[in-house]
UniProtKB/Swiss-Prot annotation:
It is linked to Ciliary dyskinesia, primary, 33: A form of primary ciliary dyskinesia, a disorder characterized by abnormalities of motile cilia. Respiratory infections leading to chronic inflammation and bronchiectasis are recurrent, due to defects in the respiratory cilia. CILD33 inheritance is autosomal recessive. This is Dynein regulatory complex subunit 4. The gene is GAS8. Component of the nexin-dynein regulatory complex (N-DRC), a key regulator of ciliary/flagellar motility which maintains the alignment and integrity of the distal axoneme and regulates microtubule sliding in motile axonemes. Plays an important role in the assembly of the N-DRC linker. Plays dual roles at both the primary (or non-motile) cilia to regulate hedgehog signaling and in motile cilia to coordinate cilia movement. Required for proper motile cilia functioning. Residues 1-12 have a biased composition (Basic residues). Its main location: cytoplasm. It comes from Homo sapiens (Human). GO terms for cellular component: axoneme; ciliary basal body; cilium; cytosol; extracellular region; Golgi apparatus; intracellular membrane-bounded organelle; microtubule. The keyword Cytoplasm applies. Residues 357-478 are annotated as: Interaction with SMO. It comes from the Eukaryota. One of its GO terms (molecular function) is microtubule binding. Keywords: Cell projection, Ciliopathy, Cilium, Coiled coil, Cytoplasm, Cytoskeleton, Flagellum, Golgi apparatus, Microtubule, Primary ciliary dyskinesia. Expressed in respiratory epithelial cells (at protein level). Expressed in the heart, skeletal muscle, pancreas, liver, brain, trachea and lung. Weakly or not expressed in placenta and kidney.
């Protein structure tokens, strides 16, 4: 159509020249050849026009498909948002359920502590009552021994008065032997009493040292684990954030380059369309330009596809970044809550340890005072016994009788010490049974023992196996 317009303008201005000749100077064959050549060019132009129309239809179809896919992806994104909201609601419901469970656990734990305190008070009252009874029995025994010693003194005085003149040498020899035996017995029982006192002191110090070591080790391990977990989480999310930011920046730069290329190609397409409308150059130049435009069009399609893929990847990365940021905030909240729970449990654990240490120290102090009182009583009895023997100069039969009574008194004191050790074993057993009940309650509510944050302290007496059997089965320590 453009050449025809130029032909009309040529007629108005002057006679056109074809192949260097005017139309009136051309022969019929030349005119027919020129007409056939023009028709061939017209056919080729029509074919090229049809080809470009087909390409335009393909591009439009591809654009429609891409638009539908975009709408589908938007619908999927909306569905995902709804699913995320539903998941968040479910998560809030689960959090409420877990909070309710924790409240129930705290309530039961408080009830157990109250029961323990009540049981401890009852046990302490019973122990005090038994101690009073034992004290009264010991006092009665002491009065009986005093009466017997008084009677023996009177009898010994009569015997000594009757035998003093006849057996002076024999009494002197017996006195020397008896003094030697008394010194041996005194040394033996002093050694036993010192060993017993040292052993009890060593047990008490060792037990307190072990309790402090276990407590410090547990606290140090717990704090180190929390610090390592927090450092790992912080480094992990910092790396993810930096990588995502770098990737987003690179994708934005790629999008900017693609957008520039697209604008450049659109301008070139506009220029090419204008050139196609103003076709006046030779056919060879048009073919070369057409091949160049086909290459540019292919590059444009490829760049456009890359741009679409890049946009899709950018959206995915942005969504992943938002999800990671949301997860990071949730984890930070959970970590803060766990830290608060850890601090609360640590405070309760420290208070419980201090209370146990105070009770143990009080019991050890009471036992030490009782042991000191018994030791003083034994020493006093031995002094009185030595004075009686030194004043009475008994015969071997009377000496044997007095020694037997002294052994009976010592056996009674040892029995009292064993009873006190048995009471201590019962208290340790009750404490360990309470720990077992606490662990069973935690497992019943689905809380792992590792999540408690500390290891419960089991009480035991050094050298004895206590708190290991069923409840109530506590043997007398040996």
């Amino acid at each position: 159509m453009a050449p025809k317009k130029k032909g009309k303008k040529g007629k108005a201005k002057g006679t056109p020249i074809v192949d260097g000749l005017a139309p009136e100077d051309m022969s019929k064959e030349q005119v027919e050849e020129h007409v056939s050549r023009i028709r061939e060019e017209l056919d080729r132009e029509r074919e090229e026009r049809n080809y470009f129309q087909l390409e335009r239809d393909k591009i439009h179809t591809f654009w429609e498909i891409t638009r539908r896919q975009l709408e589908e992806k938007k619908a999927e994104l909306r569905n995902k948002d709804r699913e995320m909201e539903e998941a968040e609601e479910r998560h809030q419901v689960e959090i409420k359920v877990y909070k309710q469970k924790v409240k129930h656990l705290l309530y039961e734990h408080q009830n157990n502590l109250t029961e323990m305190k009540a049981e401890g008070t009852v046990v302490m009252k019973l122990a005090q009552k038994e101690h009073r009874i034992q004290e009264s029995v010991l006092r009665k025994d002491m009065r009986a021994l005093k009466v017997e010693l008084k009677e023996q003194e009177l009898a010994s005085e009569v015997v000594v008065k009757n035998l003093r003149l006849k057996h002076t040498e024999e009494i002197t020899r017996m006195r020397n032997d008896f003094e030697r035996q008394v010194r041996e017995i005194e040394a033996k029982y002093d050694k036993k009493m010192k060993m017993l006192r040292d052993e009890l002191d060593l047990r008490r110090k060792t037990e307190l040292h072990e309790v402090e070591e276990r407590k410090n080790g547990q606290i140090h391990t717990l704090m180190q684990r929390h610090e390592e977990a927090f450092t790992d989480i912080k480094n992990y999310y910092n790396d993810i954030t930096l990588n995502n930011l770098a990737l987003i920046n690179s994708l934005k730069e790629q999008m900017e380059d693609m957008r520039k290329k697209e604008d450049h190609l659109e301008r070139e397409m506009a220029e090419v369309s204008g050139q196609n409308k103003r076709l006046a150059d030779p056919l060879q130049k048009a073919r070369e330009e057409m091949s160049e435009m086909q290459k540019q069009l292919a590059n444009y399609e490829r760049d456009k596809q890359i741009l679409l893929c890049t946009k899709a990847r950018l959206k995915v990365r942005e969504k992943e970044l938002k999800d990671l940021q949301w997860e990071h905030e949730v984890l930070e909240q959970r970590f803060t809550k766990v830290q608060q729970e850890r601090d609360e449990l640590y405070r309760k654990f420290t208070a419980a340890i201090q209370e146990v240490q105070q009770k143990t120290g009080f019991k050890n102090l009471v036992l030490e005072r009782k042991l000191q009182a018994l030791s003083a009583a034994v020493e006093k009895k031995e002094v009185q016994f030595n004075e009686v023997l030194a004043a009475s100069n008994l015969d071997p039969a009377a000496l044997t009788l007095v020694s037997r009574k002294l052994e009976d008194v010592l056996e009674s004191k040892n029995s009292t010490i064993k009873d006190l050790q048995y009471e201590l074993a019962q208290v340790c057993k009750a404490h360990n049974d309470l720990l077992r009940t606490y662990e069973a309650k935690l497992l019943a509510f689905g809380i792992p023992l590792d999540n408690v944050g500390f290891k419960p302290l089991e009480t035991a007496v050094i050298g004895q196996t206590l708190g290991q059997g069923p409840a109530g089965l506590v043997g007398t320590p040996t």
